[in-house]
Regions:
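Extracytoplasmic/secreted proteins, especially bacterial periplasmic and envelope-associated proteins
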Residues: 20-21, 41-45, 76-79, 83-90, ...
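Polar, surface-exposed loop/tail segments
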Residues: 157, 172-189
C-alpha cells in the first residue's frame, strides 16, 4: 500500500519524468501552508500512480479547500472546489475509458472533517464546538458499489468506518490497536 501526503516527496515512480518534476516543484513553489501541498500536485501524483501501478483502489483526500477556508479566502475556496471536480472527473473518465481499469477500480474521495455551516461567520472553522463540522461527505464509486447517486435519509456513516471498508474492498484482514468502525454496508452490492 502506498500512502503519500503533505509536503512528502513521492518515491514510488522512480524514472517518471512528470513525478520527478512535481517532486522538485513541491519544494520550489512557495505554499502558503506549513504542511499541505497544492491539490494539483496530489492530483498529478495520484493520476500517474494510477496509470503506472493499476491499483484496485485509489483513496483521495485533498486539502486546498480546507486551507483556503481557514484563511477566509472564499473565492479561492470555490475555485479549489471547482478544480477538484475537474480532477476527479479526469481520473474517473480515464478509468472508465480504459478496459484495464473499467469495472475493476474503486475510487474513494472524502475529507477529514466538515465545516461550520449553521452560523455564517463559522464557515472558516471546524471542531467540536462548531455546529456542522462533524458532518463530512464521502464518495465511493467502483465495481463493488451500487450506483445509487447521492444517498439521503439513511443511517449515519462515520469516518471511522472507512478503514474497515477499504480492507473489505481489498480483501485484507485489518487489525488496529484503536477501535475502528465496521464496514459501510451500503458500499457493497
Amino acid at each position: 500500500f502506498v500512502v503519500n501526503s503533505g509536503q512528502e516527496e513521492f518515491h514510488v515512480l522512480k524514472g517518471n519524468r512528470q513525478v520527478e518534476l512535481i517532486n522538485k516543484l513541491m519544494y520550489k513553489i512557495p505554499v502558503p501552508w506549513a504542511s499541505v501541498r497544492f491539490d494539483a500536485f496530489t492530483f498529478y501524483l495520484s493520476f500517474n500512480y494510477l496509470k503506472a501501478k493499476k491499483p484496485r483502489l485509489l483513496y483521495l483526500a485533498f486539502d486546498g479547500t480546507d486551507e483556503y477556508a481557514h484563511d477566509g479566502q472564499y473565492d479561492q475556496y470555490l475555485y479549489s472546489m471547482n478544480r477538484l471536480d475537474g480532477y476527479i472527473k479526469s481520473i474517473w473518465d480515464w478509468v472508465q475509458s480504459n478496459s484495464g481499469y473499467r469495472n475493476k477500480t474503486t475510487m474513494i474521495i472524502t475529507t477529514d472533517h466538515g465545516r461550520g455551516d449553521k452560523i455564517l461567520k463559522e464557515w472558516r472553522s471546524h471542531g467540536s464546538s462548531i455546529k456542522g463540522s462533524k458532518k463530512v461527505w464521502l464518495a465511493i464509486i467502483g465495481p463493488d458499489t451500487p450506483s445509487t447517486g447521492e444517498i439521503e435519509n439513511s443511517d449515519p456513516v462515520y469516518s471511522t468506518q472507512i478503514a474497515m471498508t477499504i480492507a473489505r474492498l481489498l480483501d485484507v484482514d485489518y487489525k488496529n490497536k484503536k477501535e475502528v468502525g465496521t464496514e459501510i454496508k451500503s458500499v457493497f452490492k
